[in-house]
Amino acid sequence: MDWWLLSFFIGAILSLYLPIVPEIFILLLFISLAIALFFNKKTRSASGLFLGMTWMLFNGFQYNNSWLVNNLDIDMMSKKVHQIEGKIVSIPSVDKAHYRFNFQLAKLNGQTMVKPFLIRLRWKLNTKESFIIPAQGHTYRLTVKVKPAHGYANEGGFSYQTWLREKHIVATGYVKSATENSLLSSNTGLRQLLYSQYVYNLPEHPLAPLLLALSFAQRNKISVETWQVLQATGTQHLIAISGLHLGLVASGSFIFFLLVARLLPLNQLLPQVIWQPLLGFNLRYLVLMLSLITTLFYAYLADFSIPTTRALTMLTLYWLTRLLGIKLTLKRWFLLTLCTLVLFAPFSLLSAGFWLSVYAVMIIFLTLWRFSFVLNHRLKFWRIVKGLLIIQLSLTLFLLPLTSFFYQQVSTVSLFANLLAVPMMSFIIIPLCLLSLILLLFNETTAHWIMQLTLDILQWLWQYLLFLTDRSHSLLSLSLVQSQIIAIVVLIIAFRCFVSSSFFNLSRVDNNIYLWLKNSRALLTVIFVSSLLTYSNSTSTHESKPALKNNNQPIDWQVNVLDVGQGLAIVIQQGEHAILYDTGGAYPSGFNLTETVILPYLQYHSINELDKVIISHSDNDHAGGLTLLRNNIAIGEVIVNDEAIRKSGDGLCLLGQSFNWQGLNFHQLWPEKKQGRDNDDSCVILISDGTFSVLLTGDISKKIERLLVSKAKDNLLTLNADVLIAAHHGSKTSSSIEFINQVKPSAVVFSAGFLNRWNMPAKLVKQRFIDEKIVIHSTNENGMVRININDRQLNILQYRRDLSPYWFANSKRKFN
């Protein structure tokens, strides 16, 4: 059975590597094959593989067809304003007058949904709506604009689309201010009532949001500064309600109910009608059931988040086997947990938190098994101390590959932080936090006092974490290469520790740590050298000295048109050297494309310094992220024309100027005058290696295109390019047929937002390129577009089709 369970789980994982979700007919074939394999003893395990794969893909099929099953047209949905009815199913996050929440759609324009689905809405309340306080459980009629679930698609960036799918959210949108917005029912869920009461009684304190995270899994109020400390010290896992928290609730409630049952005269306190039936129950079984109910309630308060659900599943299986008298090996218990999660929460496999928690449990089990000889001690206290120490060492080391892969950074002080934080959180802070939650139901004054006490103790721990954060290089940002080095080294160590019998000859070691280290000196040398290489690479900066190129040697370079929505950001790249053309936008809400897209991309590629930053013009969607960029990465030179955003030492982009960078020639073709405010002041640049060329056009209109064509015909400049980055996101005001014919590109790239309100790129413009047999690429459908030039060849890659072609991270739409 263990092999079947393992193959089922592996099949679910393998399904994630497919580029599309097959049609239902193919899935039925998979099921038929699985059944046929199951009835043959030799192939029974393989049946689990196909069933696991089919189950995951079937859930993907259902998600993708949420629109179709309700007879809704995706494209028409995004173009109109709709009136919807439904219920808020999450505690809204609030930022000033901005609310964000998950909404279960029941009706759309009066049409009842065959299968209601979730949408993620934001609602900015106006003065007429200021009396409205959205809450979980409320039913509303709202006027909204929605789009299918979508997110930016770039290397190194956060996949919002995967996150939405993980939460089963099918669409996103916003509420329009309208008189039709009305509250239909004010029935509030118990979770929301307790949350509101808790917030009302919570003392004013910078760390108060951490108590909300520990009690209700609500982390949206945690400040950026607090998150930075948690990340730098590797302690963010302590505020995600998971196995540690549920384990404390389970054990604490079990002990409490057991003491109550044994110490209190229940036969005198309880009515005979209740007490008499209890006599027939085994006391420990009754206590187990009460403990299970208590833990379930805490998981409900945490909204059954993925780490919570994983831990709850493990505990529930343990309780049920105890109650039913079933004996399970540790391995089967773990495999049953994984398969149960795949069955009831299949999209949890898309969550980084799921994999971190699963691997953490595996590491704990393996460590206790492999290092059991180290834990031998006559005194129980020292056995516990040694156990906690070695488990924390193992978790810190063996989770490094996952943390570096998911977050592109590792904490160098996490071991020291967790050695104190874990016991303090486990035995003091979390119990006090939960106690305040319980007392809130009986006495708000006492609950408030416990909250204040918890915050005071938490403040002491916080001072220690701040001390560690202030250490030099407490948090290292890692590139893909550095993450791979870490993964290889840790895998070698894991193999030697948990697999290789030659590493541990327990009879010879006999608790002699010196002998153990002596036998492992080769391995320790590898670890030390690799650590030095990773550290030096992560802290070094790259000088922007131009590389000497042999004229006969082809130059390998890339032009990466990043997916920044309705804006522009292009990275011209050679290895770890890069030039950035435009920065994307920044918005009043604090959302900034430089922080979300550009910096993660540069970090992913080990680019610690930009040789140049070129700003085409000062519109927000092109230059909004410049200030944040200046503050977060070293820049050799900024080329910008608008005086409003220029600084001393910045260069200019003017017709006739050019420069050579890493063997590439950058010819500035426009503007003629130093302005940079309007679209027609955009810095137009032709990049060429002598064989291939790419033309960057900013937001110029047909008027400037005509001037450039005229100059090209007079041999004053060259416009010919292999790839054209279309002007102004493909608007009707640009990309004239005369300009296209003069440039003569073989491919064009549009940088535009997904289903944007301006319908860019315009159909008319796209048709012009199609008529000229020019291949079209667009970031709004394809994600990041990479123009790859190497070995005297040019090829274009799309992120969704070529670089990350996985069904769970992409929409059902077809790629160009």
Briefly describe each language-model feature range:
Residues 166-314, 397, 666, 693-698, ...:
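Aromatic-rich juxtamembrane segments at the membrane interface
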